[in-house]
């Protein structure tokens, strides 16, 4: 792209860009059309005309005095305006994605992508981008990345308080290329290099524990997760499962469609989750109860279990389908929708708050466990898991009780 421009060109294009943003967002691709019929900001304090006029003044001054005018990148300037518009809303979940970020975002829900094979989350206390899971035999594992690593830099990009989706877009890239990842581990800064590869996301793992208690771990709710979960559930049933543990610890969430379809394999007839938008309109997602799971069940959660994980745990808790074991979850009780902007970019916007079957809002609160147990690391036995032990004990107790009552 040619960056050098004639006098006044930058001012004209930027003013036009902002006017387009203020007049409305035309969202195509089968989503919805949003337009501004009021002609001003919702507050009524700042009009389009005032903003456009001030921007004209800023651009006139930049055109007249800015030393590096020939280096102005109008495309980057435009992207900055779009990003700034959403950032100024003060909602960390409403985000504008440029073309590269949109491509990476779409890949992240497909079940396969070119990357390093690690799951990231935002630490609930520090807001740092943190690795919570490293896929087995992945480039991330081969590079030495570990769960708990705090991301500081991706190549030359400072991570800081960047949106998680942006950080992920930096990590992903063409198969066979290297990415330099700088992490903080136990107070020590480490610079590691991973070679990107095609990652087939295994979001579900499972095994039969002692006393015929099935264990299913779900790392995230992607497009591929439903089939993997159903396969695990069916196989454990064939093995004679007497009770079940679903482990959602460190699961940051994912697709609403995926989690509700999974819950249809477990819940009785009724509401799975309901949402309420800005106008008070309520929508319900329901279950017909055809596949209700009636055996003892526990769901493991922690402070990193968020979004779709909280829909799952909140629903099974409300119906009494499972006991929730662990600590209070993250507390993300709002729904976002991806909206195609028609030019390879997209907008992720918060459109509703969701409620559990009993009408509970968990936004900013989280799902509280029925059996609270903090994870305790055992230096002598690093593989020990006191939270899992408690879940096993909880399910076993219910199995024993149901056997006695027969």
Model regions and ranges:
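Intrinsically disordered, Ser/Thr/Pro/Gly-rich linkers and terminal tails that flank
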Residues: 1-122, 163-208, 220, 230, ...
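Cleft-lining beta-strand/loop regions that shape enzyme active-site pockets
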Residues: 2-5, 132, 141-143, 147, ...
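PDZ/PDZ-like domain segments forming the peptide/carboxylate-binding groove
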Residues: 16, 20, 44, 48, ...
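A residue-level signal for beta-strand positions that form part of recognition/binding surfaces
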Residues: 115-117, 128, 178, 191, ...
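Short, well-ordered strand-loop elements centered on a beta-strand within folded domains, enriched
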Residues: 126-135, 188-193, 273, 346-349, ...
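Conserved P-loop NTPase
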Residues: 336-341, 347-378
């Amino acid at each position: 792209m040619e960056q050098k421009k004639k006098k006044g060109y930058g001012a004209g294009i930027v003013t036009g860009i902002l006017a387009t943003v203020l007049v409305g967002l035309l969202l195509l691709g089968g989503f919805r059309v949003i337009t501004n019929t009021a002609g001003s900001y919702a507050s009524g304090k700042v009009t389009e005309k005032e903003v456009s006029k001030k921007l004209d003044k800023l651009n006139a001054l930049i055109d007249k005095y800015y030393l590096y005018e020939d280096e102005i990148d109008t495309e980057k300037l435009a992207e900055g305006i779009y990003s700034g518009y959403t950032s100024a809303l003060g909602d960390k979940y409403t985000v504008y994605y440029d073309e590269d970020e949109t491509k990476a975002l779409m890949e992240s829900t497909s079940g396969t992508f070119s990357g390093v094979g690690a799951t990231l989350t935002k630490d609930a206390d520090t807001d740092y981008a943190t690795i919570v899971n490293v896929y087995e035999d992945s480039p991330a594992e081969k590079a030495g990345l570990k769960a708990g690593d705090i991301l500081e830099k991706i190549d030359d990009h400072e991570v800081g308080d960047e949106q998680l989706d942006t950080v992920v877009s930096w990590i992903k890239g063409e198969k066979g290329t290297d990415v330099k990842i700088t992490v903080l581990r136990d107070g020590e800064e480490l610079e590691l290099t991973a070679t990107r590869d095609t990652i087939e996301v295994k979001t579900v793992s499972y095994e039969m524990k002692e006393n015929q208690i099935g264990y299913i771990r779900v790392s995230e709710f992607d497009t591929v997760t439903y089939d993997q979960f159903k396969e695990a559930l069916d196989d454990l049933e064939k093995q004679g499962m007497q009770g079940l543990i679903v482990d959602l610890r460190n699961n940051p969430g994912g697709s609403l469609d995926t989690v509700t379809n999974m819950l249809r394999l477990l819940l009785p007839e009724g509401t799975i989750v309901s949402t309420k938008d800005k106008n008070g309109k309520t929508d319900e997602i329901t279950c017909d109860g055809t596949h209700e799971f009636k055996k003892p069940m526990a769901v493991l959660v922690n402070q990193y279990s968020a979004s779709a994980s909280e829909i799952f745990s909140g629903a099974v808790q409300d119906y009494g389908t499972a006991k929730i074991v662990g600590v209070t979850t993250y507390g993300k009780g709002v729904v976002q929708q991806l909206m195609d902007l028609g030019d390879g970019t997209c907008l992720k916007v918060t459109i509703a708050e969701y409620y559990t079957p009993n009408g509970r809002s968990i936004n900013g609160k989280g799902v509280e466990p029925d059996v609270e147990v903090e994870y305790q690391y055992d230096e002598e036995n690093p593989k020990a898991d006191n939270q899992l032990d408690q879940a096993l004990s909880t399910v076993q107790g219910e199995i024993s009780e149901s056997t006695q009552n027969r």
